């Protein structure tokens, strides 16, 4: 449901403030940190913690509005902006018949691309929620930059079953400083002092919203798993068979209560293209809500396994990162 002012004649040159609120159609309560876009001219932004938003210096006219939130059906509509504008958007929760989920067989990816709703509506809905989680993180990282500190621990694993601590430190990462996914280019040479060293880049959450990633991967529903005692839908993705170079396969888990992403697992395909001595590279990433509906990385655990034992029986390396703090430059929903 949408409520808006009517455009009076002769007001095309006036500029006004467009204010509004996004609420749940079921409860009437404001939905915090929903994404609202006013087109043309205005970029997407988050609502505040009460579901309110504002666009300033809006010329009178007709605009396309898009409203998104994880766990809710997207809303697209048209509004007419006049002298005084008050908007109210009601979003309805996503409903997926879990009993109707068909677990498709794992197979070679020969027809990559986003799932077709006509062929598998449940998969298409869950895929859209996965994409929305990723897109929201992308918006958060780029428009509301933040820094987060991770405690890092590096270890070596040996064929005897022993582990040896190698190094530990605390690293600070900027949310908008990251590698971007390119099909078949997840293994590159490093920069600076690492220019002669091959580096494996495992895609991050924003990459799951990238059309390039969608076009080169197949997606399927792999069933329901229990995480922390709650049901989660598992979506698996496979790199296209046509990709000759190393890329990634993986899985993503979304809670069925609100379709928030909780975990992703990533595996390097064709690891021998990265290094003849490597047999596997994998990582598990878990997320937490820093603010309602807004995810940040909580823990990363990466494992690199050697094809043959090295000196002293070395068979692998692990890297664990744990979140210790997040600092926003500007909180989502705040004006600049």
Model-derived segments and their meaning:
Residues 6-17:
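Beta-strand-rich domain onsets/edges
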Residues 16-24, 51, 89, 101:
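A short, amphipathic beta-strand motif
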Residues 16-18, 25-40:
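Short, ordered, surface-exposed loop/turn motifs in non-cytosolic proteins
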Residues 29-32, 54-62, 70:
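Short Pro-Gly-centered beta-turn/loop motif in secreted/extracellular proteins
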Residues 38, 62, 66-78:
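A short, solvent-exposed loop/turn motif at the edges and junctions
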Residues 41-54:
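Short, acidic Ser/Thr/Gly-rich low-complexity loop/linker segments typical of extracellular
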Residues 72-87, 94:
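Structured interaction patches on ligand/partner-binding surfaces of diverse proteins
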Residues 96, 100-248, 270-274, 291, ...:
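Structured extracytoplasmic
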